[in-house]
Amino acid sequence: VRTLRAEGRNVLAWSPTGRADDTHAGHIDTSVLLSLAHPGVDLAAAEPGVTLPLPDIIDDLRRGGLAAVSPNGVLGDPTHANADDGAAVLDRWTDTLVAAVTEWARRD
């Protein structure tokens, strides 16, 4: 994005936000998938992973990938995930994306 903007291109970068200790296959991701009725979600198989904040593990994650920081590949705790939480997260993400695009479009 920085390079594109330096080249004079009007671009927007947006990514969904969440808790720093729940960043991959944890409560948030699993709840979102449940809200979308994803057939691959098996809560009976859900188990907690590493729940350290992302800033605490980011260097190891960049060096060695997910396996370097979490034996089961989970960064968070999906065991209490549910579709209602997932729907609320999707609503929040949608609102923040629409707001970001609206603000970005005003600058054009």
Predicted features, each with a name:
Residues 1-108:
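Extended, histidine- and acidic-residue-enriched regions that form the cofactor-binding/catalytic faces
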